[in-house]
Amino acid sequence: MKALILVGGYGTRLRPLTLSVPKPLVDFCNKPILLHQVEALVKAGVNHVILAVSYMSDMLEKEMKEQEKRLGIRISMSHEKEPLGTAGPLALARELLTENSDPFFVLNSDVICDFPFEEMVRFHKHHGKEGTIVVTKVEEPSKYGVVVYEAESGQIQRFVEKPQVFVSNKINSGLYIFSPAVLDRIQLRPTSIEKEIFPAMAQEGQLFAMELQGFWMDIGQPKDFLTGMCMYLQSVRQKHPEWLHVGPGFIGNVLVDPTAKIGQNCSIGPNVTIGPGVTVEDGVRIKRCTIMKGSRLHSHSWLESSIVGWSSSVGQWVRMENVTVLGEDVIVNDELYLNGANVLPHKCISESVPEPRIIM
Amino acid sequence: MLKAVILIGGPQKGTRFRPLSFEVPKPLFPVAGVPMVQHHIEACSKVPNLKEILLIGFYQPNEALSSFLLKAQQEFKVAIRYLQEYSALGTGGGIYHFRDQILSGGPQAFFVMNADVCSAFPLVPMLDFHKQHGGSQSYVILGTTANRSQSLNYGCIVANGETQEVLHYVEKPGTFVSDIINCGIYLFSPSIFQHIAEVFQRNQQELQLEENSSWQRTEVIRLEQDVFTTLAGRGKLYVYKTEGCWSQIKSAGSAIYASRLYLSQYGSTHPERLASTKEGGPTIRGNVYIHPTANVDPSAVLGPNVSIGMGVTVGAGVRIRESIVLHGAVLQDHSCVLNTIVGWDSTVGRWARVEGTPSDPNPNDPYSKIDSETLFREGKLTPSITILGCNVSIPAEVVILNSIVLPHKELSRSFKNQIIL
Ligand SMILES: Nc1nc2c(ncn2[C@@H]2O[C@H](COP(=O)(O)OP(=O)(O)O)[C@@H](O)[C@H]2O)c(=O)[nH]1
Ligand SMILES: Nc1nc2c(ncn2[C@@H]2O[C@H](COP(=O)(O)OP(=O)(O)O)[C@@H](O)[C@H]2O)c(=O)[nH]1
Ligand SMILES: [Mg+2]
């Protein structure tokens, strides 16, 4: 089986992290975002992954070469000359997708959930039509485009953008499985699959909705990245509690790479991810944070709801909160207060940032 | 024989020092570990032949004041008395009212000092200067140089560049007059009372013309506006200019600044009051005062400019900089206290951050003074040092930024730029 992942553009909303690495390679819970998807696909029997990218990235290509070997699958890159939207990339990859007549997966790249790929195949084969969209329940449907479908069969009737009166609380989760016939609907030009392809398919009774069980999050921006981390760690707690770190000073769901060093009298958690080679000195308090590879948190610092990018250094008695994001190799001097700071890579911060702002 | 008078004001004064002045009379607020006026008293005690210090104010007699005075008399071996005005008589009215007490024993001269100033107190040089400039018929004001814009907040002195005679005096002018300002420290010959008496009589005459005037108001006299202004240009008033450290202590923020000035003097005057990093003790950076009864964890890092009061507990991994921690306060592990006054018996929880914004004088202008004028600018609280009143409790892990917390408050979350009633 095949899967096409819509990797897309520059990932601007996840800056400053995406100034250092392409978004699919940003570490989410100690694993590049893309690998969460690719590994789940492989487990479901996918042996050929196509990455639809609208920009060139040597780093991504090199990393995917390695993953090809490691996972024993084929990974192709499908480069667009101009951004083709969410449908156009399927037309561009048409040849690869029609090497056989199996249905194929299509994924938005920054979605994190318990990927239900095997169930999708079953569901799709069961209704036998052109397409299946995985939908997920949201609390405030008026903020999204919702999917209205027949409860029994899952057959989609229509899509409603930002409904003002309640029609449904299910939204498109960005996970699809299609039969190759869908490719006849898509031309090689910038096209939105949600706006230009799905409505017609629904009208013709060719599109079905499958409800996702468990958590789902689009982690394309820092705030949601952290929320997604909390959800993911909770699902780890249920499925692989042995991956989580326990012991004195650890609270709730905490993921710690075995090569990280943790000092005395720290209090870590709930909802913390600590990457490889990270050093956490004595007396540090961390909650709801991701600390990426090679970073150092100096003693008595306090971090909440923040992301510390690769190889950064957070000084003693620094307080960081409110979705502060440090890019790669940032130095925060001792005793500073960062409130919602967005710090670009290779900066040295020597003054507090009491109100949210971008530090160029 | 010499004497000294310290004008300590009263409970209605010092409003800019709230909420700290609710708990202790402002003159007793600790600056660099000792009560504000102890610095004055100590300086007086070093002046040869200075026999008595009179504190004049309109505080009700109180336990804090009397026990301080008792201790100070013993420590500095000088007679100290408190004289209470029946109501606020102004900076000249009080000394006039108590002129007999001041003159009893026949002092040749006496100092008068505002309580709310921090100074190196060059009292002996002032005496020498007095002798050279008119002696018993003259009076000396201690002056210092300010920058042009800030001079407007002070009493401004125009003096003859050679003789140092004061030619013109104006209190807090609206436009620039002179960059020499009044430090609130004076040396008077007894004949000063003749000039104050003139003002007193003038007041009396003026008030007789008014209806419903109360006799009390004739006694209210301002040394600056009523006396210096008329003495200027009459060959009697001189300014002795000092380059030594000096600051007013009006706001709580200026108490931290004044502490810094006094702590740096301790290097030569009281090295025993300065803490240093020792085996098994906390890390000390710069000038730090720690009361001997305080309990400071060896992993804490203190300084520069930190004063730790009696019985204070400083937990493991605590960081304190540019702050005053008053007696009985508890700073729990990993907390961080910057540019803050932590009130008596207050508690700061683990990993809490309590931080203010200093209003230090411009470091690039040697004549710049600390601004302690307004709490609000354009309806918004101006970022200032953080003050925790007495018995305030800050929970673990929160941040309190540029805020003033009134006494006996138990906070349950973070606060920024607020006055918390
Ligand atoms: N290859 C490719 N992917 C795209 C393009 N536009 C969007 N994507 C990807 O498609 C997915 C959905 O994109 P979009 O609908 O814009 O949603 P959002 O980026 O999550 O707000 C994301 O993973 C995007 O990176 C494009 O022009 N080319
Ligand atoms: N005894 C006494 N002292 C006063 C009185 N008014 C002010 N003071 C003290 O005199 C000093 C100067 O106060 P003031 O002239 O009001 O303030 P400034 O002009 O802003 O320095 C302070 O130490 C006050 O405590 C008063 O009525 N009686
Ligand atoms: Mg005055």
From Swiss-Prot, chain A:
GDP-alpha-D-mannose binds at residues 110, 218. Mg(2+) binds at residues 110, 218. Enzyme activity is reduced by incorporation into the GMPPA-GMPPB mannose-1-phosphate guanylyltransferase complex. Allosterically inhibited, when part of the GMPPA-GMPPB complex, by GDP-alpha-D-mannose binding to GMPPA. It is an enzyme of class 2 (transferase). GO terms for molecular function: GTP binding; mannose-1-phosphate guanylyltransferase (GTP) activity; metal ion binding. GO terms for biological process: GDP-mannose biosynthetic process. Its cofactor is Mg(2+). Residues 245-360 are annotated as: Hexapeptide repeat domain. Coiled coil: none annotated. Coordinates binding with substrate and required for enzymatic activity. The keyword GTP-binding applies. Keywords: GTP-binding, Magnesium, Metal-binding, Nucleotide-binding, Nucleotidyltransferase, Transferase. The active site is at 162. It catalyses: alpha-D-mannose 1-phosphate + GTP + H(+) = GDP-alpha-D-mannose + diphosphate. InterPro entries: GMPPB_C, GMPPB_N, Hexapep_transf_CS, Mannose-1P_guanyltransferase, NTP_transferase_dom, Nucleotide-diphossugar_trans. Catalytic subunit of the GMPPA-GMPPB mannose-1-phosphate guanylyltransferase complex. Catalyzes the formation of GDP-mannose, an essential precursor of glycan moieties of glycoproteins and glycolipids. Can catalyze the reverse reaction in vitro. Together with GMPPA regulates GDP-alpha-D-mannose levels. Component of the GMPPA-GMPPB mannose-1-phosphate guanylyltransferase complex composed of 4 gmppa subunits and 8 gmppb subunits; the complex is organized into three layers, a central layer made up of 2 gmppa dimers sandwiched between two layers each made up of 2 gmppb dimers. Catalytic activity of gmppb is reduced when part of the complex and binding of GDP-alpha-D-Mannose by gmppa induces allosteric feedback inhibition of gmppb. The N-terminal substrate-binding domain adopts a Rossman-like fold and has a binding pocket for GTP or GDP-alpha-D-mannose. Substrate binding is coordinated by an Mg(2+) ion. Belongs to the transferase hexapeptide repeat family. This is Mannose-1-phosphate guanylyltransferase catalytic subunit beta. It comes from Xenopus tropicalis. The gene is gmppb.
UniProtKB/Swiss-Prot annotation, chain B:
The keyword Metal-binding does not apply. One of its GO terms (molecular function) is transferase activity. GO terms for biological process: biosynthetic process. Residues 357-385 are annotated as: C-loop. This is Mannose-1-phosphate guanylyltransferase regulatory subunit alpha. Residues 2-252 are annotated as: Substrate-binding domain. Gene3D superfamilies: Hexapeptide repeat proteins, Spore Coat Polysaccharide Biosynthesis Protein SpsA, Chain A.
